Amino acid sequence: MSDCIFVFQIPFIVYSKLDQWIFGNILCKIMSVLYYVGFFSNMFIITLMSIDRYFAIVHPIKRQPYRTKRIGILMCCSAWLLSLILSSPVSKLYENIPHMSKDIYQCTLTNENDSIIAFIKRLMQIEITILGFLIPIIIFVYCYYRIFSTVVRLRNRRKYKSIKIVLMIVVCSLICWIPLYIVLMIATIVSLYTSNIFRHLCLYLNLAYAITFSETISLARCCINPIIYTLIGEHVRSRISSICSCIYRDNRIRKKLFSRKSSSSSNII
C-alpha cells in the first residue's frame, strides 16, 4: 500500500521539482503529508513483518494464539494510523510559494522561521531519526540475528527460505531510504541553524539536487519490491513457470496442427 502511495505521488513530485506547481496550496500540504505517511508506514510495516518472522521461527508456540487475521488487520491499521499522526505536522511546513516569477509556484518548505515552525522542524527531525530509523534498525538487527541463529542451530532449510523474501525487502528498503534520510537530516539542520558554517555547507552540498537524487532512489524501491517477490518467491515463480509452460505447450499444439493441415492439403493436391 505504501508503494502505491509513492507511485500515485510521482506526477506531483515531478511538477514540484520542475517548479511548476499548479495544484494549489491545499493539495501541496496533502501531498507533503502523504509523502511522510508513505515513509513511516513502509518502515513500520517491514518492522512488523520482521517481528512476525521472529516469532514464527524463534518462538513458534508463543505466536500461535496471536496469529489471527483480526490481530494482523489491527496491527496494520495501527501502523497506518501512527504514520498519519506522525506525519500530520508536515502540513504546517510546506507551502505553495512563488518561485522566481509570480506566475511560477513551488511546493516547498516554508520560508517562515517562527517558534512554531522551528518546533515542528525539530519534532520531525526527532520523529524521522528515532521512530523512522533508529528503532526499526535496532529491531531488524535483533530479530534477524536471533532468526539466523535459530535457523543455523536447527539446520532448517525450509525456514530459511521463508525469511529470505522478508530479509531482502528490509535490506532494499534500508538501502533506498538511508540516502534520503541523511539528506533530510542535513536539510533540517541547515534550516534550523543559520550560522556561517551551515550556510557554506548548504552552498557546497547543493541540497536541492541531493534531495532530488535521494528521492529518486527511494522511489525506485516501489519497482524493486515486485521484482523481489517474482525472483525469490517460490509461489510466484511456480505460477509464472506454469503459465509459461502452458503457453509453450499451446504453441507446440498449434504448430503440430498447422503442420498436419499443411501435409493433408499437399496430399490432396
UniProtKB/Swiss-Prot annotation:
Entry keyword annotation includes Mitochondrion: no
Disulfide bridge map: 28-107
Chief location: host cell
Location in the cell: Host cell membrane
Family annotation (PROSITE patterns): G_PROTEIN_RECEP_F1_1, G_PROTEIN_RECEP_F1_2
GO molecular function terms noted in the UniProt entry: C-C chemokine binding; C-C chemokine receptor activity
TM regions (residue ranges): 30-50, 71-91, 123-143, 165-185, 200-220
Cellular component GO terms held in the UniProt record: host cell plasma membrane; membrane
Pfam family membership, one: 7tm_1
Biological processes, Gene Ontology terms: calcium-mediated signaling; cell chemotaxis; immune response; positive regulation of cytosolic calcium ion concentration
PANTHER family: C-C CHEMOKINE RECEPTOR TYPE 8 (PTHR10489:SF627), CELL ADHESION MOLECULE (PTHR10489)
Official protein name in the record: G-protein coupled receptor homolog C3
Organism: Swinepox virus (strain Kasza) (SWPV)
